[in-house]
């Protein structure tokens, strides 16, 4: 544990890596050297950061399997992001959460469809009742006297004097 947190040890490992890389890749025209060095530095940093973190987490956590799984998934997701991939590794818990969310949304939509279907059925039944009432009445013998308020209208023969009192009369006015 002392070596993991010792700064001199860390610096000596970085120096050793740099010298090893320089001896392996002596060609000055090597175009991929900065990329290889970056990947190795990231891997070394992940190594130095993850081991002490996992040791502490395993000692303090009640469920060590979940901690290890989460650390490994996080490390792989970081490496995938560095490599330029947009996909990520998901754990079973995350998949179950997403599935629960999808199932919940599907249930909500099914309830809405059920409500809409019920309303549509009620509207169709109402339209059918209206149609049945319209078709049940016959249009031949409808008494329109009630509709136009002409129930007490008399014909010319029914007037007492035989003349219509509402007809205009000739009136002469003095000038």
Curated annotation (Swiss-Prot):
Lumenal side: 1-28
Residues that coordinate or bind Ca(2+): 120, 123
UniProt keyword annotations, A-Z: Activation of host autophagy by virus, Calcium, Enterotoxin, Glycoprotein, Host endoplasmic reticulum, Host membrane, Host-virus interaction, Ion channel, Ion transport, Membrane, Metal-binding, Secreted, Signal-anchor, Toxin, Transmembrane, Transmembrane helix, Transport, Viral ion channel, Virulence
Domain of life: Viruses
Transmembrane segments: 29-51
Subcellular location(s) per record: Host rough endoplasmic reticulum membrane; Host membrane, Host caveola; Secreted
Glycosylated residues (UniProt): 8, 18
GO molecular function: channel activity; metal ion binding; toxin activity
Side Cytoplasmic, residues: 52-175
GO terms for biological process, alphabetical: monoatomic ion transmembrane transport; symbiont-mediated activation of host autophagy; viral process
Membrane topology: Single-pass type III membrane protein
PTM remark: The N-glycosyl content is primarily Man(9)GlcNAc, with a small amount of Man(8)GlcNAc.
One Gene Ontology term, aspect cellular component: host caveola
One Pfam family matching this protein: Rota_NSP4
Function as written in the Swiss-Prot or TrEMBL entry: Plays an essential role in the virus replication cycle by acting as a viroporin. Creates a pore in the host endoplasmic reticulum and as a consequence releases Ca(2+) in the cytoplasm of infected cell. In turn, high levels of cytoplasmic calcium trigger membrane trafficking and transport of viral ER-associated proteins to viroplasms, sites of viral genome replication and immature particle assembly. The secreted form acts as an enterotoxin that causes phospholipase C-dependent elevation of the intracellular calcium concentration in host intestinal mucosa cells. Increased concentration of intracellular calcium disrupts the cytoskeleton and the tight junctions, raising the paracellular permeability. Potentiates chloride ion secretion through a calcium ion-dependent signaling pathway, inducing age-dependent diarrhea.
HAMAP family: ROTA_NSP4
Record's comment describing the protein's domains: Binds 1 calcium ion per tetramer.
Subunit structure comment from the entry: Homotetramer. Interacts with the immature particle in the viroplasm. Interacts with host CAV1, early and late in infection. Interacts with host integrin ITGA1/ITGB1 heterodimer. Interacts with host integrin ITGA2/ITGB1 heterodimer. Interaction with microtubules blocks trafficking to the Golgi apparatus.
Record-stated family: Belongs to the rotavirus NSP4 family.
Protein's recorded name: Non-structural glycoprotein 4
């Amino acid at each position: 544990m002392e070596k993991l947190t010792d700064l001199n040890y860390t610096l000596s490992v970085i120096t050793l890596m740099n010298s090893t890389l320089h001896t392996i890749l002596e060609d000055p025209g090597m175009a991929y050297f900065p990329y290889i060095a970056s990947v190795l530095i990231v891997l070394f940093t992940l190594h130095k950061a993850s081991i002490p973190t996992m040791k502490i987490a395993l000692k303090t956590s009640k469920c060590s399997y979940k901690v290890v799984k989460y650390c490994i998934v996080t490390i792989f997701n970081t490496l995938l992001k560095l490599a330029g991939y947009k996909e990520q590794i998901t754990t079973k818990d995350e998949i179950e959460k997403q599935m629960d969310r999808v199932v919940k949304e599907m249930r909500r939509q099914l309830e809405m469809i059920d409500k809409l279907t019920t309303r549509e059925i009620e509207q169709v039944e109402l339209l059918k009742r209206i149609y049945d009432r319209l078709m049940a009445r016959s249009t031949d013998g409808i008494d329109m006297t009630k509709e136009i308020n002409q129930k007490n209208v008399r014909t010319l023969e029914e007037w007492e004097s035989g003349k219509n009192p509402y007809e205009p009369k000739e009136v002469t006015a003095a000038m």
